[in-house]
Amino acid sequence: DKNQNTRITLILRNTYNGVHSNQISFPGGKKDKSDSNLKHTAIRETVEELGIDETLINLVGPLSQVYIPPSNFNVQPFVGIYNGTPFFNPDSKEVSLLIKPLLKDLLNIKSIKSEVFVQNKKIIVPSYIIEGHVVWGATAMIINEFITLFNDIINS
């Protein structure tokens, strides 16, 4: 927007017995049989997890698919714009916290290396620190692609 108040919405997943427990991610999940395509899945999952109005979401398009080895999933991210200021009512069963950095801040963020634990093993991964949270893995890759594409558009 003209006031540069556009935000990206990430979630901190709740703690549960699974490989993505307590991790930062974009809203999303598995394709249901009722989903006509992956675009529908992306919108449905976003609405379910964030509790926002589906009619105000405008999908811009897909980013590159990302494979996630620990869960053996191919993730198809989509970029969407919410037309208006969202009123969030996050699903407390899935979402512990909403993280909403300003787009203008995200565009200037630099990748760092962080230590994280995956299945009780310490690994060093490329990551971002966003509002005090370590963002790594598929989420960091999606953010990196988004930043690169957005900056290419702005600078062309």
Q: Which residues fall in each region the model found?
A:
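Basic, gly/Ser/Thr/Pro-rich low-complexity segments located predominantly at protein N termini
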Residues: 23, 27, 33-34, 66, ...
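A broad "ordered helical/assembly scaffold" signature
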Residues: 1, 54, 67, 140-141
